[in-house]
Amino acid sequence: MNAEIKKYLEESLQNKKGLTFYVNGNTVNGYVIRIVDDVTVEVRNQSSSKVLVFLDRLDAIAMS
């Protein structure tokens, strides 16, 4: 896992800060509820209680 991406993920996990994940031309908004492993994180948002994001498909990440 990239060190910069890990900083974003850990801050979201600790402080429930929102992130926008850009994945294959789509966006997924939410905050991290669990870092599963080096390539997968579990995210929660208003419409879904659990979303798995595969970091190997990640184009970009932005913090709200």
Q: What are the functions of these language-model segments?
A:
Residues 1-29, 37-40, 44-64:
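Short glycine-rich, low-complexity segments
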